[in-house]
Regions:
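N-terminal, Lys/Arg- and Ser/Thr-rich interaction peptides
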Residues: 1-40
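Positively charged, aromatic-enriched nucleic acid-contacting surfaces
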Residues: 39-162
Length: 173
């Protein structure tokens, strides 16, 4: 595989510290979340404005129900323009909870209710779309360093080294 094949990937893979945040709670606690606005920015830097140098189309939306909870899912196709030609569809599927059962907090008394109650997210479709976009963009290399574990969100003191830089530094010693 030539470096030419990896040029786009290498241009998109590094995530600046200010575009990352550590997830503070839930099943993903301690993992890295990448700010969605950064993804839009890096795509615009690489391909041009959305709608001109890149765009996406929602192919399908659907919901799934499990007991009393409902999740929403989005399948979309991402397209990028390279050298005047449009790519084939780059598919991404994402999801988010539309209705979930949660313990409701009584903020006045700083207590949680003992019963679970349904919570409806008015941002679920947007969040599922954002998730699907991140899955599609990941295939181009967007934020690859984070997904490959080459960027440590907790101790991020310097830019992540690429695998090639790490290999080169060990070979030259």
């Amino acid at each position: 595989m030539s470096e030419d094949n990896l040029k786009l990937w290498n241009d998109l893979k590094a995530v600046p510290r200010e575009a990352k945040k550590t997830i503070q709670a839930g099943r993903l606690k301690g993992m890295t979340d990448i700010k969605p606005q950064w993804r839009l920015q890096i795509m615009t830097e690489q391909f041009g404005a959305v709608g001109f140098g890149w765009y996406y189309e929602v192919a399908k939306t659907w919901t799934e129900t499990y007991n009393t909870e409902v999740s929403v899912h989005v399948q979309l196709n991402l397209y990028v323009n390279i050298g005047g030609g449009w790519s084939k569809p780059i598919s991404g599927i994402g999801g988010s909870m539309l209705i979930s059962n949660e313990k409701i907090k009584d903020y006045e008394n700083d207590l949680y209710d003992t019963k679970f109650k349904p919570y409806h997210s008015d941002e679920a479709y947007k969040m599922a779309t954002t998730d699907a976009l991140s899955v599609a963009m990941k295939q181009l290399g967007v934020a690859a360093d984070v997904y490959m574990g080459l960027s440590d969100s907790k101790y991020d003191k310097k830019p992540a080294q690429t695998v090639n830089q790490i290999k080169a530094s060990t070979v030259n010693k």
